[in-house]
Design a protein with these regions (language model features):
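Acidic, metal/ion-coordinating pockets
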Residues: 1-153
Length: 153
């Protein structure tokens, strides 16, 4: 039997660094870069590990607000996420705050699959797939991406 670990990053809300850039000498206890560093240090001890973004990454920080207000593109944020080498992600309710066109553009730019089995647009799922299967040794691992019921179908 393989030794498997799941690392889940959730509710980052665009906090990449240990600051929100709103004042000097103000620090957050965690950000995406620090979380990724901790994960990468720990995952070495496992035969197989999966790094997952559990959603709510696209909205919430001054950085995200700046991107939507001044460039209309999430590309700088996506660049950070793509470098983190996530195996897959899911959608949180805040991914929809800037509108569906912005979200769809962001999803096209990500270099990992985003799983969401329960959000629909015009009778089809919003993402390409809601389920992903992985073969780990002699085991098949299935992962389902689901989003809170507060998002309309």
């Amino acid at each position: 039997m393989s030794n498997i670990a799941f690392y889940v990053v959730s509710d980052v809300h665009g906090y990449i660094f240990l600051t929100d850039f709103t004042s000097r000498n103000q620090y957050q206890p965690m950000g995406l870069l620090l979380a990724n560093h901790v994960i990468e240090q720990d995952r070495r001890q496992y035969d197989q590990s999966f790094k997952i973004d559990n959603g709510d990454f696209l909205q919430g920080s001054p950085f995200c607000n700046y991107l939507i207000a001044h460039s209309g593109s999430s590309q700088p944020l996506v660049d950070f996420y793509n470098r983190m080498a996530f195996d897959f992600g899911t959608l949180g309710n805040h991914e929809f705050n800037y509108g569906l066109p912005y979200l769809k553009d962001t999803l096209r730019r990500l270099n990992y699959p985003v799983l969401c089995a329960n959000i629909y647009e015009n009778d089809s799922t919003l993402t390409d797939n809601g389920v992903q299967y992985f073969q780990v040794g002699d085991q098949t691992v299935g992962v389902i991406g689901l989003t809170t019921q507060f998002i309309p179908h």
